[in-house]
């Protein structure tokens, strides 16, 4: 019995040492308190933010959306100095539900490489890709079943909340939800259904115990945006918006990286629009960032960590040749209700056709 205990203890020590030697650690909420920042890695690196890729199966758009995503991935992985990782903040596919949504996700996955249940941007599997869902990933049946089947099986129990620690930076990934439908006036500029009270409680717990110098929150919907002529702020999270902003300020979050608006904007907590790139985040309180999409154009943004500073760079656009694609023309545009009505009709027509031609 004593030998057996010694063997188990030795095995436990080996596992702990193996985990601590990994450069990037994915932390679930159940073990967050027991693991600290990985040691021995340079604090000088950069990563790439991509968002709103809106991929569809080749049958639905002649391969145009897949070409856009592949273009940005091929571009950022061709740099002489490679990014440490890539993050994609939602709307991975144009719609995510049912059989046609499954086809969209399969096409999305064709753009990546996979090893040990982790997606990578490069063939050598040295640049991991981390993701969070957007409202389109819920379309149209208001669930993430296909997202969890094809993209992320690891964080279902944690409600798609997880943390990546790289060097002295913690990245908090959150799900800002499906479209918020309780107020009809918001349907023209859809709010995110989150963040719920348990999301806020989770974030506060993790921020309060975070050991790293830098903190970055990533989700699909912004918390700060422009206001219309009547003073209403659209396209943001519908719940706990001010609580979320206060938490970010209280715990010195450097950046909140989002998408959804298909625009490039940077705000502070007081809703001031900032435009002097690049930003040294050390000189600001929390910056609330919207990165431009990969649907109406092909965009990405670099975030660079140099010693004790994080530098936010402007969005870059990749010019690609646009094939003649009627479906792409119809669905391009803002997140308006008219585009969503078109997509809803298209979704049901496609699924009706699939149900007629594909046996269960």
Regions found by a protein language model. Name each.
Residues 49-51, 86-91, 128-135, 216-220, ...:
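Active-site neighborhood of phospho(di)ester-bond hydrolases with catalytic His/Asp-centered motifs
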Residues 97-210, 243-249, 255, 266-314:
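Extended active-site neighborhood of metal-dependent phosphoesterases/phosphodiesterases
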